[in-house]
A protein has these predicted regions:
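Post-signal-peptide, soluble extracytosolic/periplasmic N-terminal scaffold domains
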Residues: 2-4, 36, 42-295, 627-702
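Outer-membrane beta-barrel translocator/channel fold
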Residues: 235, 266-275, 440-525, 578-596, ...
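Structural motif
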Residues: 67-70, 83-84, 173-177, 299-308, ...
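Conserved small/polar residues in nucleotide/adenosyl-binding loops
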Residues: 822-826
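Short, ordered, surface-exposed loop/turn motifs in non-cytosolic proteins
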Residues: 74-96, 725-735, 805-819
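Residues on the lipid-exposed face of transmembrane beta-strands in outer-membrane beta-barrel proteins
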Residues: 189, 211-215, 247-252, 398-402, ...
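Residues that define the transmembrane beta-barrel architecture of outer-membrane proteins
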Residues: 203-209, 242-246, 297, 392-396, ...
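Transmembrane beta-strand segments that form the barrel wall of outer-membrane beta-barrel proteins
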Residues: 162, 181-199, 220-232, 261-265, ...
Length: 827
């Protein structure tokens, strides 16, 4: 190294600040130079970068003076992840301008953008005087505020003293960022059918179709829910077709009130009074609008099927779920309930016609509210039920819950109708280590169908507790005691004192009533105990218990329901032992079932780096016993196929015998496909006497300004992916969801009032397609159809060698395009 260069670096007292990734190929020479410089007295000279470290020819190196001031990028617009005080805010395009010699480039953030991230603009002197589109000089207006761009991470780190931040809850998203979505129409369809060949009972055919349609205009959402059922039998003449209208409603959010307005068919909250369906109007709080840090249950249903069975779930007289399940234990955790409360009646219909029927209580956890938070509901309309034995009286209901200091909550409500008056008052308390408890009492005055008048009270206790030390989670302990004169509002809507909840027909009733349809107001409810507990056993085992016990006045008959199970794992081998018991008050005997399931993935025997398709397959064994001598054993394989693992299969075979049925071989095979245009399934099961073929298709149709897009079944809130030109691109973290031939896709669900990340997998793009950005973030309101737009560039990729005067471009040169649609990428 020359003496001149050495003297230059003796002047450069800041050489240690040169970023190592800029000069990675020359670190040896830099180390020597800095070592010599360390022996020389420090000076205050400005940073100087000697281009001879990069090339002997100075013309081979561009002007790098901007890097001498720590400016790693030229001014421009860059897409960055924004973090404020180490918390993620958003990913967006930010314009960076030239700052002073020490700052390099600085972000241009407007007052509204900073306010959306939680800055209290009123607390910063002079900030509210800036124009709406002006760049806020953040670091000069707020002492100790910083803004630093991490080029390598594409991350903009902002720090602002807490004194200048708004007092917002964690996870708060300003309402101005909520997206009400686009105007569009939607249709959900779910069709299922099965054909049963019974050597003794003949042939039977069943079909079920559920249609959920809707229309979004601005913030308004119109929805309709209708079902159709069909059945025919060789032993009866003709077939039976039945259309059933479930509900229609119009709703929208009222953002200033953090509430929701519903017109038409709806349901009351089941937190204070029993939930009921109505036709009328309701204004109620919507806690989904609150951030997660300020928020305080559809139940999970467990059951056991003896064979391939049809599971139907009813709530408030309506069929809300219908599916075919394989033999053995099953879990249903995706119920779309027709109401926010109301016990669920679960029917398991076996292929031989036998049924298991039990009721799953559906109620809320203790009603505690945060200090200062108020939740309310006001409803006016007429009572609505799918039971033909019930009338439609008009009623008014209001409820109110308010959080007080020290963990207390007070709540109450009223129900008013011509033949019914009820008033409720209760208190709740967060008792810290002792759990949470709520107690309330309802005073009711009722007039029954025989015009008899009754006064009564009902007292309810609810308790919730988690014992983290022992791994015990007491999810819900509830007890309700009612005096003999207490009736709820639904009891007064019956036209007779007793009967069956079935549809009336002209002439002789052809349907044989079931004991679960029977009601008798002379035997009103007395006491009800319900319990749900989960217990962690070690690191890999979980025990769960759930049950309820309902007694009645005037009879010793009781309703009983109990579920227990043990889930455990040894390495990657899982097994489950489960037990169920159900009994209706008017049923003789009990239905019981004991089951064992073992699952062993084939990856247990494969190398960790194996790419065999068997990595996505497992072997299984199941045994079920009804404790009356009937036992079924099944063994087989199940797994997934295709690149996206969106084709699942299961093949099982075994033996069933003992008890009341015949003995012989049994088994089933199923295929389920989840695709970009919808879902489909088909299955076949057999035993010695019965053969069954079942099938189904489901999906969603979205009609919008850009055309019609097909997809998987749509949830209440969905995302329309718009990426014209990017056909057949996979949507990340979604099974089977890809863009269609036009570049559109439907993300079938999204979380309302929360930021949802939508991303396209760039590895699935065509060779001639690029995306400016593969990630979009949306914050939909409830029921919205929001658009996530991606700009696709379709063209031909070129690899070019650029020269100037027949020489390579200087190191660090900037290359720009005079044509806006040309996209240049330089290494």
């Amino acid at each position: 190294m020359s003496y001149l260069n050495l003297r230059l670096y003796q002047r450069n007292t800041q050489c240690l600040h040169i970023r190592k990734h800029r000069l990675a190929g020359f670190f040896v020479r830099l180390f020597v130079a800095c070592a010599f410089a360390a022996q020389t007295p420090l000076s205050s000279a400005e940073l100087y970068f000697n281009p001879r470290f990069l090339a002997d020819d100075p013309q081979a190196v561009a002007d790098l003076s901007r890097f001498e001031n720590g400016q790693e990028l030229p001014p421009g617009t860059y897409r960055v992840d924004i973090y404020l005080n180490n918390g993620y805010m958003a990913t967006r395009d930010v314009t960076f301008n030239t700052g002073d010699s020490e700052q390099g480039i600085v972000p241009c953030l407007t007052r509204a953008q900073l306010a959306s991230m939680g800055l209290n603009t009123a607390s910063v002197s002079g900030m509210n005087l800036l124009a709406d589109d002006a760049c806020v000089p953040l670091t000069s207006m707020i002492h100790d505020a910083t803004a630093h761009l991490d080029v390598g991470q594409q991350r903009l780190n902002l720090t602002i003293p807490q004194a200048f931040m708004s007092n917002r809850a964690r996870g708060y998203i300003p309402p101005e960022l909520w997206d009400p979505g686009i105007n569009a129409g939607l249709l959900n369809y779910n069709f299922s059918g099965n054909s049963v060949q019974n050597r003794i009972g003949g042939n039977n055919h069943y079909a079920y179709l559920n249609l959920q349609s809707g229309l979004n205009i601005g913030a308004w959402r119109l929805r309709d829910n209708t079902s159709w059922s069909y059945n025919s039998s060789d032993r009866s003449s003709g077939s039976k077709n039945k259309w059933q209208h479930i509900n229609t409603w119009l709703e929208r959010d009222i953002i200033p009130l953090r509430s929701r307005l519903t017109l038409g068919d709806g349901y009351t909250q089941g937190d204070i009074f029993d939930g009921i369906n109505f036709r009328g109007a309701q204004l109620a709080s919507d806690d989904n609008m609150l951030p997660d840090s300020q928020r305080g249950f559809a139940p999970v249903i467990h059951g056991i099927a003896r064979g391939t069975a049809q599971v139907t779930i009813k709530q408030n007289g309506y069929d809300i779920y219908n599916s075919t399940v394989p033999p053995g234990p099953f879990t249903i955790n995706d119920i779309y309930a027709a109401g926010n409360s109301g016990d669920l009646q679960v029917t398991i219909k076996e292929a031989d016609g036998s049924t298991q029927i039990f009721t799953v209580p559906y109620s809320s956890v203790p009603l505690l509210q945060r200090e200062g938070h108020t939740r309310y509901s006001i409803t006016a309309g007429e009572y609505r039920s799918g039971n033909a034995q019930q009338e439609k009286p008009r009623f008014f209901q209001s409820t109110l819950l308010h959080g007080l200091p020290a963990g207390w909550t007070i709540y109450g409500g009223t129900q008013l109708a011509d033949r019914y008056r009820a008033f409720n008052f209760g208190i709740g308390k967060n008792m810290g280590a002792l759990g949470a408890l709520s107690v309330d009492m309802t005073q009711a005055n009722s007039t029954l169908p025989d015009d008899s008048q009754h006064d009564g009270q009902s007292v309810r206790f609810l308790y919730n507790k988690s014992l983290n030390e022992s791994g015990t989670n007491i999810q819900l302990v509830g007890y309700r005691y009612s005096t003999s004169g207490y009736f709820n509002f639904a009891d007064t809507t019956y036209s007779r004192m007793n009967g069956y909840n079935i549809e009336t027909q002209d002439g002789v009733i052809q349907v044989k009533p079931k004991f679960t349809d029977y009601y008798n107001l002379a035997y009103n409810k007395r006491g009800k105990l319900q319990l749900t507990v989960t217990q962690q056993l070690g690191r890999t085992s979980t025990l769960y218990l759930s049950g309820s016990h309902q007694t009645y006045w005037g009879t010793s008959n009781v309703d009983e329901q109990f579920q227990a199970g043990l889930n455990t794992a040894f390495e990657d081998i899982n097994w489950t032992l489960s037990y169920s018991l159900t009994k209706n008050a008017w049923q003789k005997g009990r239905d019981q079932m004991l089951a064992l399931n073992v699952n062993i993935p084939f990856s247990h025997w494969l190398r960790s780096d194996s790419k065999s398709q068997w990595r996505h397959a497992s072997a299984s064994y199941s045994m079920s016993h009804d404790l009356n001598g009937r036992m079924t054993n099944l063994a087989g394989v199940y797994g997934t196929l295709l690149e996206d693992n969106n084709l699942s299969y299961s093949v099982q075979t075994g033996y069933a015998g003992g008890g009341d049925g015949n003995s012989g071989s049994t088994g089933y095979a199923t295929l389920n496909y989840r695709g970009g245009y919808g879902n489909a399934n088909i299955g076949y099961s057999h035993s010695d006497d019965i053969k069954q073929l079942y099938y189904g298709v489901s999906g969603g149709v979205l009609a919008h300004a850009n055309g019609v897009t097909l997809g998987q079944p749509l949830n209440d809130t969905v995302v329309l992916v718009k990426a014209p030109g990017a056909k057949d691109a996979k949507v990340e973290n979604q099974t089977g969801v890809r863009t269609d031939w036009r570049g559109y896709a439907v993300l079938p669900y999204a979380t309302e009032y929360r930021e949802n990340r939508v991303a396209l997998d760039t590895n699935t793009l065509a060779d001639n397609v690029d995306l400016d950005n593969a990630v979009a973030n949306v914050v939909p309101t409830r029921g919205a159809i929001v658009r996530a737009e991606f700009k696709a560039r379709v063209g031909i990729k070129l690899l070019m060698t650029l020269t100037h005067n027949n020489k390579p471009l200087p190191f660090g040169a900037m290359v720009t395009s005079a044509v806006s649609y040309t996209h240049l990428t330089l290494p």
